[in-house]
Amino acid sequence: MVRLKSRYILFEIIFPPTDTNVEESVSKADILLSHHRASPADVSIKSILQEIRRSLSLNLGDYGSAKCNSLLQLKYFSNKTSTGIIRCHREDCDLVIMALMLMSKIGDVDGLIVNPVKVSGTIKKIEQFAMRRNSKILNIIKCSQSSHLSDNDFIINDFKKIGRENENENEDD
């Protein structure tokens, strides 16, 4: 008997600011805080799954929707961090990621971006990655508030550091 192989997708919901008044002296911490905020109570596991299924049906038709829905599960979602983990079949992973990226509303909440962050074969590794990622974001916010570097220098140094860490993680996998 062949084992059922599944993939886990870590995603985040980003809420871009709707006001057009942008100050020139906005720090990176302010940008991170304005985009990464808690989800409203309307965004629940049930509403996210309904919206994913609706997106699959609209964009892939009956065949794609039926193909992806066979193993589609939302394993975890936190309203405080606006992050979640989806379980899907290995062959349908790309289709589910496409459906996530094409979503622009969940329930009554409109104007959001669903960002697939990482795909993994085990839920343990995706949870570890999510914890490391959240601690990095918190460190970025703390360091940028206390740093005397300009925002551009801080952003460039931070992207170089994250790029080196991602190369090391890819070598470990």
UniProtKB/Swiss-Prot annotation:
Pfam families for this protein: RNase_P_Rpp14 (PF01900)
One of the GO BP terms on file: tRNA processing
GO molecular function terms noted in the UniProt entry: ribonuclease MRP activity; ribonuclease P activity; ribonuclease P RNA binding; RNA binding
Catalytic reaction equation(s): Endonucleolytic cleavage of RNA, removing 5'-extranucleotides from tRNA precursor
Superkingdom of source: Eukaryota
InterPro entries tied to this protein: Pop5/Rpp14/Rnp2-like, RNase_P/MRP_POP5, Rnp2-like_sf
Its EC number(s): 3.1.26.5
Entry keywords, A to Z: Cytoplasm, Hydrolase, Nucleus, rRNA processing, tRNA processing
Localization of this protein: Cytoplasm; Nucleus
An annotated GO cellular component: cytoplasm
Entry keyword annotation includes Hydrolase: yes
Record SUPFAM superfamilies: Rnp2-like
Quaternary structure and partners: Component of nuclear RNase P and RNase MRP complexes. RNase P consists of an RNA moiety and at least 9 protein subunits including POP1, POP3, POP4, POP5, POP6, POP7, POP8, RPP1 and RPR2. RNase MRP complex consists of an RNA moiety and at least 10 protein subunits including POP1, POP3, POP4, POP5, POP6, POP7, POP8, RMP1, RPP1 and SNM1, many of which are shared with the RNase P complex.
Annotated family: Belongs to the eukaryotic/archaeal RNase P protein component 2 family.
Role, per record: Component of ribonuclease P, a protein complex that generates mature tRNA molecules by cleaving their 5'-ends. Also a component of RNase MRP, which cleaves pre-rRNA sequences.
Remarks, miscellaneous: Present with 2230 molecules/cell in log phase SD medium.
Protein name: Ribonuclease P/MRP protein subunit POP5
